[in-house]
Amino acid sequence: MSISKAIAADLLEIKAVSLSPSQPFTWASGIKSPIYTDNRVTLAYPEVRSQIEGAFAELIKAEFPEVEVIAGTATAGIPHGAIIADYLKLPFAYIRSKPKDHGAGNQVEGRVTKGQKMVVVEDLISTGGSVLEAVAAAEREGADVLGVVAIFTYELEKANRKFADAGVKLATLTTYSELIEIAKETGYVTKEELELLKKFKENQETWQN
């Protein structure tokens, strides 16, 4: 089994990702979704956590070999980013969702020098909006952002467009497509549920019709 499929299987096993096509979850945006993800759960499982951080380190070395600093997004990207930075023996910073309203008013915490080559760590890519805002904040501070890495992506077309429009490279450990196939192979979902999950990826508004 490939590392991406192994991680997808782990996410299902520890219930970091839950699938429920027949009783959908409601996202904050109001969208009815057959999937819910809380990758913070991975931190509670040392073996899973170690595999994820090791895979992140290898992914970054392969995709972004010039990296000089790792930055985590607040809050979910911070623990993963800090562990990855330790693996790679690199400096670590983190990026707030908005600047502090006191003190120095920093949005990027840590020491980032102008032109320093950065990789931003996120746990999940949904629409991509929040992590791309973090990238923009880091660039305003002078960082040269090489790209974004994440544990998992829903592979939504709107996110793909946003990354393409921003000119930001995205690399993930595993994907929605891989995860739902693993879910079918392991009996987590039925063939009929798999078809609903595929429809959700194609169109988040009409998948239930």
From Swiss-Prot:
Provide the function of this protein.
Catalyzes the transfer of a ribosyl phosphate group from 5-phosphoribose 1-diphosphate to orotate, leading to the formation of orotidine monophosphate (OMP).
- Matching Pfam families: Pribosyltran
Q: How does it assemble?
A: Homodimer.
What residues does 5-phospho-alpha-D-ribose 1-diphosphate bind to? R96, K100, H102, E122, D123, L124, I125, S126, T127, G128, G129, S130
For this UniProt record, give its keywords in alphabetical order, as a comma-separated list: Glycosyltransferase, Magnesium, Pyrimidine biosynthesis, Transferase
Which Enzyme Commission number(s) are on file for it? Answer: 2.4.2.10
Q: Indicate which residues the UniProt annotation says bind orotate.
A: S126
Query: What is the protein's given name?
Result: Orotate phosphoribosyltransferase
The cofactors it requires, by name, are:
Mg(2+)
Pathway(s) this gene product operates in, as recorded in its UniProt entry: Pyrimidine metabolism; UMP biosynthesis via de novo pathway; UMP from orotate: step 1/2
One annotated GO molecular function is: orotate phosphoribosyltransferase activity
PROSITE patterns, alphabetized: PUR_PYR_PR_TRANSFER
Matching InterPro entries: OPRT (IPR023031), Or_phspho_trans_dom (IPR004467), PRibTrfase_dom (IPR000836), PRTase-like (IPR029057)
Family membership, please give it.
Belongs to the purine/pyrimidine phosphoribosyltransferase family. PyrE subfamily.
UniProt GO BP: 'de novo' UMP biosynthetic process; pyrimidine nucleobase biosynthetic process
Q: Which reaction does it catalyse?
A: orotidine 5'-phosphate + diphosphate = orotate + 5-phospho-alpha-D-ribose 1-diphosphate
HAMAP family in the record: PyrE (MF_01208)
